[in-house]
């Protein structure tokens, strides 16, 4: 007997070491573990280190455990073991292995005989075993591995036998053995299990639960023993099931769960491994109802609160698999559904079953690759479905089944289907499939491949390689052209035509043949290779009845379509057995124009109508595939323009509705006049195409004009009226004040006096709506002011009536009254004339010009009645009043103080009281308290003088004194300024169409609030003659009357803006309708009253919103600096470790509104909604920072620094980490941006002035100093305020540093002159002149300068704000001659030289500069303005000749453009002496002829890949390969941390191992790399023929691509799989 030697095993997994995945590796601490365990531990690490499981020592691993040393001593033992010695492992039991081997044959035999799982020696016991009558239980062998469950120490599955007393019967069962602990309520558990047994004992399609036995401190659950599971069956089929298996197993499970629900049992644990197969191959449900019974004792009571950062959920208590757990079963969100303890219900099983079906259909576990916390965030917080669900589409699953699975995954339990309904669905589809032999263990025929043979091959040797269809499908999917040809050739040579036919007709699990797969890939070469054989059927259909031509069209490959048509594909076929759409409809759905051209040229019907009444052209226009629609029209599809669909819309109507000018223009070009006339005037529900085009709203007015112009030229009826309002195109354009469109219609010959159904002409509508531009154009075009509508109103009536709202109409009355035939005496049907309407207006609204125009037409208004307090002025025709001027002037304004007899009145003017006659004055619109006013433009000097304010200053009327003087308050002034009312005018702040907001702090309104709420937003409807406003609000039926001072301007919303509901709005004015604060939508339409129509993704109908409830979302892009808004109480997915002060960098942007933000203290991006964050000012390299005073513990630690430490930012990582240089510190100080505070950047002695961006409202102190004044920083305060001093003011004042900008200080020796346009210097001219020049001799600490002007004795004292530095260069500076300067000798524009001095005329500088250019003996002298600064070259720089230089000035000297040399010397005139290794002598070059070569080092943000010369990086490859593309994220002491889109952690390497590559940018035209077998995240609907453009680039390089003719979300791709498309654009 040979002795056994103990071989140490891995202490983590208890598995013997080997030389493959279990090879022993050593950590830096000396402890060793197997490679597989270390890889799994490293995969959960957030960085490049790994903590030893035994001693907790941290080892630097790099990018992969491959770099760790092997334990060669252990490997020697493994080699010795393979030599024949017997070894044991401390953690294994040989007897168990032997028992398992012994039992395997018996199990196989029993399965082959078809015995029931719990078979017995005799059948007296029935299907359910009475545990009490079978006291003898023996555990035979353990099945599988030990696992843990709930609060139990371990759960073991055993193969066991139970026998009745006296050995009368014996049964084979499966036993779940669980160790009991002291804190378990065993009695309660046994009672619950007994109730479960009784409830389920008569249910079908369930694994029978026989009862529970307590033995040896364990609880044993007895149940039927089965022969595999759905999961094992999937593994046998390479991870997938056939459609038949999905339907059969689905029906079995649905039946079993439905019966359990009827018995009151909720399964709670449905997943493929718990769906077992009995001896007959039927699926049965196991582990039902056990989860709540076997939960942890610590979870018996409901926790009062939940911390989402700790994934200790209900799933932990009941040990549910998170991959299949319904949202309501996660515990913390139970309040969203029910009030019971766990939140589960029978509908929860529907979710689990849906996830299980997803795995059965795709072969992938739902949420595969995500942690439990990530699954919780996705399922409960984001309400997402498993991403694998999307992969079901296109794999041969019936649409009804796919839809049913989607309904199972509804977030709301009430929306999920019942299991009875699902059973009916499965049975209905099973009836359509011929019954095949069961896939049970009894079926002894081995499954050869995963395809269903349509016709059984005649070849008897089905194991031959070429006869296996799976191989053919594999090489087709890989694009292996030679492999396809070889397989088909061997099949033809070996088995003849029948073998080839069987290969080509075979279908994969998705029901597709090899030809379908080749077309789906878009490879014309593969299609040709298959169709070379006569046995190939070009119109073979898949299980859904689709021919290969449909797949080629979906792939967008015109080459494949051409090959199929050449081989006889039927281009006039229809889908769904002839009752569905034609292949042309399929092509128009996908939109590839070249494919459509191939079909139509081959004979496809361009005017075919599908089963929904839509033509091919309808489909193309609806999808906005313009090129495809044009191809249809060019190939006989013009007749489709006359076909109306179910919504009574023709393709022409749809083109107008989608502003598709190109299609309509091409239709007019290719169609006959008869075809155009038949289609152009067909009415839609809203009117003809012309009416629709004229009504196109804002942001598309240009397209609307083009459409109207095209349609009118093509013969559209201009008198056609829309169905709703009875307006023609001209009426609609005039009412919308679209003057360009009105001009287009009039230029087309349409009569300006065209009438609508109400006999209204366009001029009437323009006057009624205040469309002033259109009124002017219509009057110029001959509109008749005398035409009356059905109410008898002409243009005069309408203008006078609307003047109460539209003040411009009073001016239009003056214009219209000039018409020689103006019908001013005509009465309307109500008996009113123009005079009646004007009499109803306040007399002060009627100007003197209008009164004179009316008098000329014989219209006399009643005498004006004056009252005390009325504002008046003298009529302009008064030259000498009856009582004289009495101190007043012709333009004086006053108010009535007393009314005397005989029309005499006492008027209070600023100059005093005056007696005037009533017919000598006219009424004026008064200025009232609170109104905004300013000085009239024609006033040169105010009556009461200036007092600090400027001509542009806007003030507020405080009061009107009894003597007629106004008191006006200005910002910053301590008291009111006296003003003559004749010199002031009201400020016009708003015009029609402006967006305004009612002031939030408004407590009372002059004209009343009504139903209006402060803070509401609206649009100015019109401006009344008294300057008051009518504002349209979305929630009011009529405009609201207000004063301009009661509202404030607000940034308007525009079509296309992305918006969300404000966080301060608890309940929006228009109901939520299922939306939340996190819902993000795009404005698609804006009503006249400001009502927003918003398109929200995944919402079937638009959502309405009041603009005051909404806010714009910043136009974020990757790289923006952001933080959580102050108004956000909690981000969409919780705070986690983020605080309000945290600042991060935008990492990714999803289309659904979610964003990923990189924070320097997190290893993974923080997920939240785009509505949760706002932009902040980013930090920049070079800025000085210190720690914010409120910070006690920085995120990244103090690093031996203090709150007083000041650092200069030297580098910024992509996660926002600030690396700052601190004086006296060797390494950079790493600071979180949320902890840092930016210093002002100013120093004592800096020269500053007010920022121009402050507009007209600087601080009051600075206003007293003067906007253009210059000050000097005297001291810097901690609060951010700077103490300033200036040369003309005593004392100092404080201003915040954000209001200031730094300017260059004047220095001694600089040449200066006076500022252009200066009227007088601060202290007068004092013999100086505006053109004087001088040199600064002294600069004082307060900025005062002393200048020595040429020709003036002594030093001249000056304010630096009055002076300007002369542009001049210092001696030795390198300069370049500017473009446009005339040539001098060999010197021309672009020549580079060196400054040698300046020119003088006598003792004064003449403004010229002397420059030495190489190659010229004389120096160039000319104006300094002809020169610009050039980059100075230095010795040692590498250079080469510019490609634009054909012949260097001093010759090539044996060199070429490719020669690179080093500057060895530079002459005083700039001539370069270049050394090159190839040259025999020094090479002379002109500095203007060369360019420097600088090898730029890698920096953060660069796109990189590993150099081709690197075989193994210093820190190993890990998951990265030589073609991987990443982005430099961080730099640390020569090491680079690179972010790859497929890695969660940063990849570590040396800087020298990488090379810079061109980054992808938004807008790049791209395609999928040739030769790529499978993109990293799958093909989706794309192929190698797909071309598109980049619409998004994440910070880690992940690309979001919009491919041509594809709808929905962008395609996500790895940049290594994508290349630039050089052929596009």
From Swiss-Prot:
Pathway listed for it is:
Protein modification; protein ubiquitination
Recorded GO CC terms: early endosome; trans-Golgi network
Q: Which GO terms describe its biological process?
A: abscisic acid-activated signaling pathway; defense response; developmental growth; endosomal transport; late endosome to vacuole transport; negative regulation of abscisic acid-activated signaling pathway; protein ubiquitination; response to abscisic acid
Q: Which PROSITE patterns match?
A: ANK_REP_REGION, ANK_REPEAT, PROTEIN_KINASE_DOM, ZF_RING_1, ZF_RING_2
| Gene disruption phenotype | Plants are seedling lethal and are hypersensitive to glucose and abscisic acid. High accumulation of ABI5.
Tissue specificity annotation = Expressed in all tissues of young seedlings. In flowering plants, only detected in the youngest part of the stem, anthers and the receptacle of immature siliques. Not found in mature leave, older parts of the stem, flower parts other than anthers or mature siliques.
- State where ATP binds: 147-155, 176
Zinc finger annotations (RING-type) as residue ranges: 10-56
Query: Per the UniProt record, which EC number(s) apply here?
Result: 2.3.2.27, 2.7.11.1
Task: Please report the PTM annotation for this entry.
Answer: Autophosphotylated and autoubiquitinated in vitro. Phosphorylation enhances self-ubiquitination.
**What does the protein in this record do?**
Mediates E2-dependent protein ubiquitination. Acts as a negative regulator of abscisic acid signaling. Required for ABI5 degradation, by mediating its ubiquitination. Together with EDR1, may regulate endocytic trafficking and/or the formation of signaling complexes on trans-Golgi network (TGN)/ early endosome (EE) vesicles during stress responses.
Q: How does it assemble?
A: Interacts with ABI5 and EDR1.
Name assigned to this protein: E3 ubiquitin-protein ligase KEG
The organism encoding this protein is: Arabidopsis thaliana (Mouse-ear cress)
């Amino acid at each position: 007997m040979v002795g056994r030697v103990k071989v140490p095993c891995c202490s983590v997994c208890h598995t013997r070491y080997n030389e493959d995945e279990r090879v022993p590796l050593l950590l830096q601490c000396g402890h060793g573990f197997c490679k597989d365990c270390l890889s799994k531990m490293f995969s959960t690490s957030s960085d490049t280190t790994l903590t030893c499981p035994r001693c907790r020592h941290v080892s630097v691993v790099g990018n992969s455990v491959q770099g760790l040393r092997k334990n060669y001593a252990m490997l020697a033992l493994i080699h010795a073991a393979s030599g024949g010695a017997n070894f044991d492992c401390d953690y294994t039991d040989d007897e168990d292995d032997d028992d398992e081997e012994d039992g395997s044959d018996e199990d196989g035999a029993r399965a082959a005989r078809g015995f029931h799982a719990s078979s017995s020696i005799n059948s007296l016991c029935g299907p359910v075993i009475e545990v009490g009558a079978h006291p003898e239980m023996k555990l035979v062998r353990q099945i599988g591995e030990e696992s843990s469950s709930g609060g139990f120490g371990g759960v073991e599955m055993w193969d066991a036998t139970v026998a009745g007393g006296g050995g009368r019967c014996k049964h084979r069962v499966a036993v779940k053995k669980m160790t009991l602990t002291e804190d378990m309520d065993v009695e309660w558990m046994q009672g619950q299990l007994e109730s479960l047994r009784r409830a389920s004992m008569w249910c079908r399609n369930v694994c029978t639960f026989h009862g529970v036995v307590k033995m040896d401190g364990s609880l044993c659950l007895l149940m039927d023993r089965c022969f595999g599971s759905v999961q094992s069956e999937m593994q046998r089929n390479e991870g997938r099931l056939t459609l038949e298996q999905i339907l059969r197993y689905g029906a079995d499970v649905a039946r079993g769960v439905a019966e359990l629900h009827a018995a009151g049992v909720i399964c709670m644990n449905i997943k493929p491994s718990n769906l077992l197969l009995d001896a007959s191959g039927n699926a049965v449900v196991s582990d039902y109802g056990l989860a709540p019974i076997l939960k942890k004792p610590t979870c018996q009571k409901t926790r009062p609160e939940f911390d989402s950062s700790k994934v200790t959920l209900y799933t932990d208590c009941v040990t549910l698999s998170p991959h299949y757990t319904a949202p309501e079963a996660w515990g913390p969100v139970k309040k969203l559904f029910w009030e019971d303890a766990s939140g589960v219900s029978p509908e929860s099983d529907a979710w689990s079953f849906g996830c299980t079906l997803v795995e059965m259909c795709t072969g992938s576990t739902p949420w595969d690759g995500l942690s439990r916390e990530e699954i919780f965030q996705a399922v409960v917080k984001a309400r997402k479905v498993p991403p694998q669900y999307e992969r079901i589409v296109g794999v041969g699953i019936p649409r009804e089944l796919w839809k049913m699975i989607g309904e199972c995954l509804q977030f709301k339990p009430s929306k999920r289907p019942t299991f009875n309904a699902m059973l009916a669905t499965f049975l209905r589809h099973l009836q359509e499939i011929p019954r095949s032999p069961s896939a049970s263990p009894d079926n002894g025929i081995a499954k050869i491949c995963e395809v269903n043979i349509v016709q059984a091959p005649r070849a008897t040797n089905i194991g031959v390689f070429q006869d296996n269809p799976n191989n053919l499908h594999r090489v087709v999917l890989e694009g292996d052209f030679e492999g396809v040809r070889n397989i088909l050739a061997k099949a033809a040579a070996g088995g003849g035509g029948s073998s080839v036919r069987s290969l080509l007709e075979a279908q994969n699990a998705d029901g597709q043949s090899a030809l379908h797969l080749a077309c789906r890939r878009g490879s014309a070469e593969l299609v040709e290779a298959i169709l070379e054989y006569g046995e190939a059927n070009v119109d073979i259909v898949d299980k859904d009845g689709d021919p290969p031509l449909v797949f080629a069209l979906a792939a967008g490959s015109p080459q494949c379509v051409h090959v199929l048509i050449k081989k006889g594909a039927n281009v006039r076929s229809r889908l769904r057995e002839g009752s569905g759409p034609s292949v042309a409809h399929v092509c128009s759905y996908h939109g590839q124009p070249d494919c459509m051209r191939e079909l139509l040229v081959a004979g496809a019907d361009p005017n075919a109508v599908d089963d929904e009444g839509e033509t091919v052209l309808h489909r193309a226009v609806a999808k906005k595939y313009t090129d495809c629609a044009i191809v249809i029209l060019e190939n006989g599809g013009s007749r489709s323009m006359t076909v109306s669909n179910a919504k009574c819309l023709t393709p022409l109507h749809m083109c107008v509705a989608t502003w598709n000018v190109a299609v309509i223009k091409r239709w007019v070009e290719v169609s006959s006049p008869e075809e155009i006339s038949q289609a152009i005037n067909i009415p839609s529900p809203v009117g003809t195409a012309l009416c629709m085009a004229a009504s196109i709203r804002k942001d598309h007015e240009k397209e609307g004009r083009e459409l109207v112009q095209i349609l009118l030229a093509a013969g559209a009826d201009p008198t056609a009226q829309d169905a709703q309002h009875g307006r023609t195109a001209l009426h609609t354009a005039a009412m919308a004040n679209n003057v360009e469109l009105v001009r287009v219609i009039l230029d087309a010959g349409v009569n300006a006096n065209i009438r609508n159904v109400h006999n209204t002409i366009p001029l009437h509508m323009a006057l009624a709506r205040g469309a002033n531009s259109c009124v002017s154009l219509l009057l110029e075009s001959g509109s008749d002011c005398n035409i009356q509508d059905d109410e008898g109103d002409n243009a005069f009536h309408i203008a006078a009536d609307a003047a109460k709202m539209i003040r411009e109409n009073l001016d239009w009355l003056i214009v219209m009254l000039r018409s020689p035939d103006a019908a001013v005496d005509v009465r309307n049907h109500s008996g009113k004339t123009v005079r009646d309407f004007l009499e109803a207006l306040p007399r002060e609204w009627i100007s003197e010009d209008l009164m004179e125009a009316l008098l000329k037409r014989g219209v006399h208004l009643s005498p004006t009645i004056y009252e005390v307090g009325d504002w008046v002025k003298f009529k302009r025709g008064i030259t000498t009043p009856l009582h004289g001027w009495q101190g007043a002037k012709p333009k004086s304004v006053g108010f009535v103080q007393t009314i005397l007899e005989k029309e005499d009145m006492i008027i209070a003017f600023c100059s005093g009281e005056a007696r005037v006659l009533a017919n000598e004055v006219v009424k004026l619109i008064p200025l009232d308290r609170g109104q905004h006013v300013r000085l009239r433009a024609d006033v040169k000097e105010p009556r009461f003088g200036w007092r600090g304010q400027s001509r542009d200053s806007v003030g507020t009327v405080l009061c009107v004194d009894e003597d007629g003087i106004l008191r006006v308050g200005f910002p910053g002034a301590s008291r009111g300024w006296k003003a003559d009312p004749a010199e002031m005018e009201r400020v016009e702040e708003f015009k029609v169409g402006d967006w305004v907001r009612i002031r939030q702090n408004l407590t009372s309104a002059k004209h009343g609030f009504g139903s209006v709420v402060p803070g509401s937003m609206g649009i100015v409807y019109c401006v009344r003659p008294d300057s008051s406003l009518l504002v349209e609000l979305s929630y009011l039926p009529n405009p609201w009357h207000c004063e301009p001072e009661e509202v404030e301007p607000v940034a308007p919303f525009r079509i296309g803006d992305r918006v969300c509901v404000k966080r301060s709005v608890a309940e929006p004015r228009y109901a939520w309708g299922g939306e939340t604060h996190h819902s993000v939508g795009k404005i698609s339409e804006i009503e006249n009253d400001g009502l927003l129509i918003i398109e929200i993704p995944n919402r079937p109908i638009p959502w309405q919103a009041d603009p005051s409830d909404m806010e714009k979302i910043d136009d974020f892009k990757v790289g923006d600096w952001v933080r959580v808004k102050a108004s956000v109480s909690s981000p969409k997915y919780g705070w986690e470790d983020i605080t309000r002060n945290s600042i991060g960098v935008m990492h990714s942007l999803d289309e659904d509104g979610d964003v990923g933000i990189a924070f320097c203290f997190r290893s993974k991006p923080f997920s939240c909604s785009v509505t949760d964050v706002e932009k902040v000012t980013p930090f920049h390299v070079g800025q000085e920072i210190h720690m914010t005073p409120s910070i006690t513990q920085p995120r990244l630690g103090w690093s031996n620094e203090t709150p007083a430490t000041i650092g200069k930012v030297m580098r910024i990582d992509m996660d926002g980490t600030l690396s700052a240089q601190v004086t006296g510190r060797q390494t950079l100080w790493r600071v979180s941006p949320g902890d840092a505070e930016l210093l002002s950047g100013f120093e004592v002695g800096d020269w500053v002035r007010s920022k121009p961006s402050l507009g007209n409202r600087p601080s009051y102190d600075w206003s007293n100093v003067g906007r253009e004044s210059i000050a000097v920083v005297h001291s810097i305060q901690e609060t951010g305020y700077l103490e300033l001093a200036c040369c003309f003011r005593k004392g100092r004042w404080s201003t915040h540093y954000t209001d200031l900008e730094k300017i260059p200080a004047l220095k001694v020796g600089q040449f200066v002159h006076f500022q252009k346009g200066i009227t007088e210097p601060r202290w007068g001219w004092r013999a100086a002149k505006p053109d004087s020049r001088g040199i600064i001799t002294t600069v004082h600490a307060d900025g005062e300068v002393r200048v020595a002007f040429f020709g003036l004795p002594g030093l001249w004292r000056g304010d630096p704000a009055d002076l300007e530095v002369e542009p001049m260069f210092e001696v030795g500076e390198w300069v370049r001659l500017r473009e446009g300067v005339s040539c001098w000798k060999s010197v021309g524009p672009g020549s580079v030289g060196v400054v040698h001095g300046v020119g003088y005329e006598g003792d004064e500088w003449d403004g010229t500069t002397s420059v030495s250019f190489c190659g010229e003996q004389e120096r160039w002298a000319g104006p300094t303005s002809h020169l610009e600064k050039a980059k100075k070259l230095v010795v040692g720089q590498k250079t080469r000749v510019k490609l634009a230089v054909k012949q260097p000035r001093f010759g090539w000297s044996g060199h070429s453009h490719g020669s690179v040399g080093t500057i060895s010397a530079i002459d005083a005139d700039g001539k370069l002496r270049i050394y090159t290794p190839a040259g025999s002598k020094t090479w002379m070059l002109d500095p203007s002829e060369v360019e420097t070569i600088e090898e730029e080092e890698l920096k953060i943000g660069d796109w990189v890949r590993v150099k081709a010369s690197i075989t193994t990086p210093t820190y190993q490859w890990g998951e990265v390969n030589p073609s991987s593309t990443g982005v430099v994220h961080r730099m640390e002491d020569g090491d680079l941390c690179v972010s790859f889109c497929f890695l969660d952690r940063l990849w570590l390497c040396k800087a020298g191992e990488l090379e810079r590559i061109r980054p992808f940018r938004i807008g790049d035209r791209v395609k999928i790399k040739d030769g790529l077998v499978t993109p990293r995240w799958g093909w989706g609907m794309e192929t190698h023929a797909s071309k598109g453009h980049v619409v998004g680039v994440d910070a880690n390089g992940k690309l979001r691509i919009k491919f041509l003719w594809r709808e929905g979300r962008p395609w996500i791709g790895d940049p290594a799989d994508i290349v630039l498309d050089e052929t596009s654009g």
